[in-house]
């Protein structure tokens, strides 16, 4: 029996501990201030909304003017006439205005508020058009900046360039220095490039 009692004590202690924990958890859940506070807020809000809706319906019913039968008939007739006017306005003749500033038909009669639009000639520069006579003074043309000089060497290509005088002077300077001149545009006009360092290293 001693062995059985020794086994029952820890088991009963564990069972008691579980029971105590469950009870404490339930107490905490029920007495949580956040849950109760939220429920109270919802209850207060619902009560305020109900009170406001009742108050607004009471004020609406009190503020609503009391109408007699003739006034109600006249008001309903006005709304009926307005609906008919809107529905059947397209059936009216073309002479009657549908809008305040819009008139159907021609606009030949002058209106005090009407302003003529700017003519298209203003935008198309009609006043600056070319005169009918054949005057080419404003047209584009090639303009020579300097007077063309007569080439001394007789080449016709040098006349095409503005710096032809400089080219001729350069050719004359080459002649005076003893360099041979070749016709312009030939491949022998400039000496070929020779890599002198490579040639010297091959001989060594």
From Swiss-Prot:
Region described as Disordered: 147-204
GO BP, one annotated term: B cell activation
Side of membrane Cytoplasmic, spans: 29-204
Main location: membrane
Segments on the Extracellular face: 1-7
Membrane-spanning intervals of the chain: 8-28
Phosphoserine PTM sites in chain numbering: 61, 96
GO cellular component: membrane raft; plasma membrane
Post-translational modification remark: Phosphorylated on tyrosines following cross-linking of BCR in B-cells, high affinity IgG receptor (FCGR1) in myeloid cells, or high affinity IgE receptor (FCER1) in mast cells; which induces the recruitment of GRB2.
Keywords of this entry: Adaptive immunity, Cell membrane, Immunity, Lipoprotein, Mast cell degranulation, Membrane, Palmitate, Phosphoprotein, Signal-anchor, Transmembrane, Transmembrane helix
S-palmitoyl cysteine lipid sites: 27, 30
Family matches, as InterPro entries: LAT2
Functional note: Involved in FCER1 (high affinity immunoglobulin epsilon receptor)-mediated signaling in mast cells. May also be involved in BCR (B-cell antigen receptor)-mediated signaling in B-cells and FCGR1 (high affinity immunoglobulin gamma Fc receptor I)-mediated signaling in myeloid cells. Couples activation of these receptors and their associated kinases with distal intracellular events through the recruitment of GRB2.
Protein name, as recorded: Linker for activation of T-cells family member 2
Gene behind the chain: Lat2
């Amino acid at each position: 029996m001693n062995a059985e009692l020794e086994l029952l004590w820890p088991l009963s202690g564990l069972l008691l501990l579980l029971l105590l924990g469950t009870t404490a958890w339930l107490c905490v859940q029920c007495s949580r201030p956040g849950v109760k506070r939220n429920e109270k807020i919802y209850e207060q809000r619902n009560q305020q909304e109900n009170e406001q809706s009742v108050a607004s319906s009471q004020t609406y019913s009190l503020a609503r003017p009391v109408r007699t039968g003739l006034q109600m008939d006249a008001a309903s007739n006005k709304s009926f006439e307005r609906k008919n006017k809107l529905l059947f306005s397209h059936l009216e003749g073309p002479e009657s205005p549908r809008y305040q500033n819009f008139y159907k038909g021609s606009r030949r009669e002058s209106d005090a508020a009407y302003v003529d639009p700017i003519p298209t000639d203003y935008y198309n520069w009609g006043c600056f058009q070319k005169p009918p006579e054949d005057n080419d003074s404003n047209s584009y043309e090639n303009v020579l900046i300097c007077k063309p000089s007569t080439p001394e060497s007789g080449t016709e290509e040098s006349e095409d360039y503005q710096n032809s005088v400089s080219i001729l002077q350069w050719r004359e300077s080459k002649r005076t220095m003893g360099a041979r001149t070749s016709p312009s545009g030939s491949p022998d006009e400039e000496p070929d490039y020779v890599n002198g360092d490579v040639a010297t290293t091959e001989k060594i």
